Amino acid sequence: TLDGDHYVLNGTKMWITNGGFADLYLVFGSVDRQKKQKGIISLIVPATSPGIRHGEPIDKMGQRASNTTAVTFKNVRVPKENLLAGEGEGFKKAMLALDITRPMIGIGAVGLARTAMELATQYAKQRIQFGVPIANHQAVQFMLADMAIGIDAARLLVWRAASLADQGMRNSREAAIAKAFAADMAMRVTTDAVQIYGAMGYTKWHPVEKLMRDA
């Protein structure tokens, strides 16, 4: 709500990455709900502003090293000069930001999956079953091959999206494809890595269970 030379913020947002550590918040909020997305603006808000409170870190299944909290705003006054994008522009800025962050998430998924594949490959060469390493069994070889196919495909999709961004070109479609494919691929690869480890994969003695949760 605009009040003189200040915007007044009220509300709560969940799932804020680094919510407990941030010095600044980039806040997207509505000044006119009747205008729907065209009524959204964005503001730069210092985390020390009176009326801001962040919750305790959310106890997540995966990505536990990432500080994730709720952030509550209660009558937080923000000067008009902190306006980053006004009505009709805030939503556009939010969508354009995804063109950068989606490839970043995608490449994280690629790295996570690659680690899982390398660990599973190493374990498969060491684990002896029926007198030979399980890496010699065709069923395991198929799983490792599918991992490599998915990882390489995801990496290329991410590179394409990132290359377009580096050139200042619009990459909304490519960024969305890269993130979606890489995220699904990481889930498949880490699940198969746990399978290759067998019962050991279900324990915290080996890191593949963590990779699966993070995926």
Question: What residues fall within each predicted segment?
Answer:
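A short core secondary-structure module
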Residues: 5-6, 10-55
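Short, solvent-exposed coil/turn linker segments
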Residues: 46-47, 78-79, 133, 198
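Short, solvent-exposed loop/turn segments at the edges of secondary structure
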Residues: 20-22, 38, 66-68, 212-213
